[in-house]
């Protein structure tokens, strides 16, 4: 049986651009793409923490080191520059593969600097 698990995410990324007339996609700093284990043209889910919007698009590369998170095309209507978003990618795998799988989690600060990377999320306290 195949199950779907979180593969990688950028947590609390700040939207730096919203380009309505650019080809639809999400441009992400190439360094962030590598840290989160994402790929160019990979499908991603975007969760807008500021307005609750949730939508799908795909990754395109932005200049490495630029800290760019740009929502393009129709996705630009779902955000405002400055919004904080979670960008997530998922992967299907067997249960046996899932037993040893670890996601790549990248936490960003308010300026899109990497705060930390990890492969676990602490248990939520009651």
Curated annotation (Swiss-Prot):
It catalyses: L-aspartate + H(+) = beta-alanine + CO2. The active site is at residues 25, 58. Pfam families: Asp_decarbox. One of its GO terms (cellular component) is cytosol. It is found in: Cytoplasm. Keywords: Autocatalytic cleavage, Cytoplasm, Decarboxylase, Lyase, Pantothenate biosynthesis, Pyruvate, Schiff base, Zymogen. Its cofactor is pyruvate. Its main location: cytoplasm. It is an enzyme of class 4 (lyase). One of its GO terms (molecular function) is aspartate 1-decarboxylase activity. Pathway: Cofactor biosynthesis; (R)-pantothenate biosynthesis; beta-alanine from L-aspartate: step 1/1. CDD domains: Asp_decarbox. Is synthesized initially as an inactive proenzyme, which is activated by self-cleavage at a specific serine bond to produce a beta-subunit with a hydroxyl group at its C-terminus and an alpha-subunit with a pyruvoyl group at its N-terminus. Its EC number is 4.1.1.11. The keyword Iron does not apply. GO terms for biological process: alanine biosynthetic process; pantothenate biosynthetic process. Binds 1 pyruvoyl group covalently per subunit. Substrate binds at residues 57, 73-75. The modification Pyruvic acid (Ser) is found at residue 25. HAMAP family: PanD (MF_00446). Heterooctamer of four alpha and four beta subunits. Belongs to the PanD family. This is Aspartate 1-decarboxylase.
């Amino acid at each position: 049986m195949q199950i779907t698990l979180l593969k990688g995410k950028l947590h609390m990324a700040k939207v730096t651009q919203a380009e309505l007339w650019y080809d639809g996609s999400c441009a992400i700093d190439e360094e962030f793409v590598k840290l989160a284990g994402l790929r160019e043209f990979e499908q991603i889910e975007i969760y807008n923490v500021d307005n609750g919007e949730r939508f799908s698009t795909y990754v395109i590369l932005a200049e490495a080191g630029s800290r760019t998170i740009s929502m393009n095309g129709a996705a630009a209507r779902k955000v405002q520059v400055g919004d904080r978003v979670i960008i997530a990618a998922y992967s299907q795998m067997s249960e046996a593969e899932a037993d040893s799988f670890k996601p790549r989690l990248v936490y960003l600060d308010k300026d899109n600097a990497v705060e930390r990377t990890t492969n676990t999320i602490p248990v939520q306290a009651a």
